[in-house]
Amino acid sequence: MSLHTGWPRTVNSSFLKKHRSSLCTCQHTSSVLPRSFSTTPDRHVQQSADFSSTSRSYDRLGRRAREKLLDREFFLSLLSSATTKREAKSYLARLKAQHPKSPDANKPEPEKSATAPTLPSGVNLGSFYGASRSVYESPVFRQGPSPSAPPSLEPVERLHLALVRLSTPQSLDDNIIDGVAKTLSQLNRLGLTCCVVVDPGTEGVASALRQVAIEQADRLAVAIQKQPDSKSLRLDSVFSIDPSRPGLPQVFSRKALLNPLRHGHTVILTPIAYTEDVPRAIIVPANDAVIALTKELAGLASIPDPDEDPMVTAERIGRLQKEVSLDRVILLDPLGGIPAFNRRQPSHVFINMEQEYDDIENELLQAREMVPATETSLLKAGPNSVADNNPISKFVHAEVVPVPSGSTPELKTAVPQRSAIEGHLENLRVAQKALAMLPAASSGIITSPFEVASSAQTSPTSEFSAVGTRRQRNPLIHNLLTDKPLLSSSLPMSRRGPTNNGQGAVYPVTSHTTFVKRGMPLTMLPNPWTEPWTPQSRPRLKLDDPSIDLPRLVHLIEDSFDRKLDVQDYLNRVNDRLAGLIIAGEYEGGAILTWELPPGVEDDGSEASNARMVPYLDKFAVLKRSQGAGGVADIVFNAMVRSCFPNGVCWRSRKNNPVNKWYFERSLGTWKLSDTNWTMFWTTPGLVEDSQKFRDYEAVCRSIQPSWADDTGVVD
């Protein structure tokens, strides 16, 4: 039975979609919906329509009002997740580009006439010389195959997906599950369809884990089904495995997986694979299921025939990759984001895998060795029983993300038997393996279901007034809109100060969400770990060194500043005072840093001269196509202030530079230089208290002459 016609309201309304899905979804029973409709009450309503038209109109008005309220709640959540209007517009532009109109969409369709055929001259002869209508419509029996229309050559619209792994949902209460379901529903409405893998954990026998996985998948499906304009479906028999060859499971049918996703369903999978020889259900690690799905959705699952032409193989894989774009890999784990032991923050905000993966993995491995063997008992004892001088122990006691106010699940059941650090290692590794198979534009998010659910909660004042305190940003919605983490990774901890949550409680703005990118390699010349950047370093690096691609560096500067550089004049100025160079990726971003002396101080190499040298950021550039996305600026800035110049650096910027807000947030201080168009910034601690050093910084920022070829017309 189809519900596409016969209703007075549009089929896209939440009311109709809700009940249409109850008839079309094969995996759910009537328990999915809070109500069921029988035919008898419907006939009774139809017979009494003349006497209850007023009540029916009120009912229709109430339903429309409820739908408007739900839409308003959705858009408020959407707008609150974007930090700026520019980011919201940028997302809408990307969404429009993902759904281009076909070139024939605006062409009027030719009218189909029910009349008889015409002569070539266009004269309609009616049915006089033609067969009657009954002859035209009579069935035709053919011995051979019926002629079929040629297949449509129009490309299938690309499906944008998020692959989600939800860990131990049995430890989460209904409020958390509902909040996660609401967020997944909102992602679907924003054009990012979700495929969820339920991870029951590793505690228990295989048969019990299979049952838990099925029950929790149904539980999440019901929660999603309750959301407006949402459909969910639990798929069975998705994975197959060869017991004779241990390894990753495989997706049994790509078509069976993609069809419900194309129809707007949130598909929920259990990590259960079936053996190929004798059908037998086997529980597999959820991370293996995530990797197998990533491999399939990336078009890399098929094994090429050795005798097949490589061009044919590449073309076949290319067609598969054009069908699906796996944009996000989302790991929802009660552990939250990847912890940062060496920094003054609870977790890594952003991880550039190409640059940081090995270091963070080694950091976690070292932390695991330091965890005491009695960690399970310590976890139950609480954080007060841990010595304050052991940062690793502090982390082990607080590895589960604090639950927001208003939610009080039993956190002790969310602590898995494996160590917390081992869980973070698995999250880091599965994110790295998945992103390695995906395009550079794809990204990963590691966060807690508590954080997602708390940001999805409806504000108590939203039903009455749109005026109120800005709600907490949803990390998943925010990342979809901006392709950025909730907090910039280059933002100092002092800038993540306390804020008011609208109820009188003050809490620190910290993020337990880690944003992960395959990223780009980072090159620092010279390597500050082997050759620290000091004024005494000799000989100094030069920009025309063979290890530097000068033409690409010049293009980076000119593209970023939108101005032509006087290359020779610039080389003459910086080559004898270059401190180092930072390059992100294939010259997508970079920084040129120098040692500068105040006017009147001679560079004679003496200790007094070296003591007066000022660490100066001469050029900070990011290609236009990489600005505002991908974290290129954060990667370069972090390398500068953490690795190259940890004791501080200064730079200047024109007072009307739109990037100054970004500089203000990341500097320790600023100073507007009088009688100039410059503002000085610095990250040096205690600079204001050191009057001599402050005067040197100011003198350098005043005295440096620009090296632009088109310097006329721009007042510096």
From Swiss-Prot:
Residues 37-58, 96-121 are annotated as: Disordered. Residues 537-706 form the N-acetyltransferase domain. Its EC number is 2.3.1.1. Residues 101-112 have a biased composition (Basic and acidic residues). Disulfide bonds: none annotated. Residues 37-56 have a biased composition (Polar residues). InterPro entries: GlcNAc_Synth_fun, Vertebrate-like_GNAT_dom. PANTHER family: AMINO-ACID ACETYLTRANSFERASE, MITOCHONDRIAL (PTHR23342:SF4), N-ACETYLGLUTAMATE SYNTHASE (PTHR23342). This is Amino-acid acetyltransferase, mitochondrial. It comes from Aspergillus fumigatus (strain ATCC MYA-4609 / CBS 101355 / FGSC A1100 / Af293).
